[in-house]
Amino acid sequence: MARVLITGGTGLVGTAVKNLLLQKGYEVVLLTRSTMSKEGYAHWDINAGTIDATAIATADYIIHLAGAGVADKRWSVARKQEILDSRTKSSALLVKALEETPNKVKAVISASAIGWYGPDKNSHSNNAHNNDIAAQGFVETDPSYPDFLGTTCAAWEASIAPVTANTNGLQKRLVCLRTGIVLSKHGGALKEFLKPLALRMAAILGNGKQTISWIDVRDLAKMFVYAIENESMSGSYNAVAPVPVSNKTLTKTLASLLYGKFYMTAYVPSFILKIMLGEMSIEVLKSTTVSPQKIQDAGFVFDYPEISKSLSTLDL
């Protein structure tokens, strides 16, 4: 079976992708900063610009997930630079390694994010319960938004784009998956939603009407594998579920699954979020409605298209 080299393979998404690949019979190698010699792992050092040449030479596919967590820390100037550099420098190192190392890599599947897009252009975000709403959302041809996340995503995709160049060692098929808010019981955004619910408190952010374009981690892992296996796919694709939800709907759905009717609801004012999160508060208060139509047209079928099915099967 084919060998897949994964960067960022120990994170939330990387672990799900790795496990699915192994279930399907692929051989998986994780690129890691650790110098410990261990089967299934290879070393790279982004800051030093070094990478295990054997890992590149023996890979059939590369899944590129490396990057500092966007929401892990408050956005200081230094942290924003780290978020950007961890993505662009790792991409540049992969491009350089592919160019300099004889290899058989058929495709590179890279993460990106719906941070590419800005706030919704229309007022449709207030009707996030409508099953047809995603069809009205952002599509892949929309330009990147000129804020921190938009410019970061644009630089991220641009930094990996040279793998398609018509030169020796490159000429790879490239797919960039612009990922929405990932829902998983193992961490990520859902962990933050669950914290106040430990006190039976459904904490709705702002007015709660802002649209969340989300994706179940199981569908996202399936999508990365799908991108490997479907040679007709290339370019950018939105990795979001077909039915986005409002912040209020997501929060109350979670509360109902955990406690039935026996929970309290509280609204967290915008000014409190701005004090707590700083610039990042803009991201949790804005609506970004994104359409997955392109990936669906490519034949991908979501197992968890609606929030109720996703949350009810996550074994929270």
Question: Residue spans of the language-model regions?
Answer:
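Mid/C-terminal beta-alpha module of Rossmann-like enzyme folds, strongest
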Residues: N230-E279, S312
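C-terminal amphipathic/interface module of NAD(P)-dependent oxidoreductases
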Residues: I282-L316
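Catalytic helix-loop patch of NAD(P)-dependent Rossmann-fold dehydrogenases
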Residues: D85, S123-C176
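Conserved Rossmann-fold NAD(P)-dependent oxidoreductase catalytic core, especially the SDR/UDP-sugar
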Residues: A92-D147
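N-terminal Rossmann NAD(P)H-binding glycine-rich loop of SDR-like oxidoreductase domains
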Residues: V4-K24
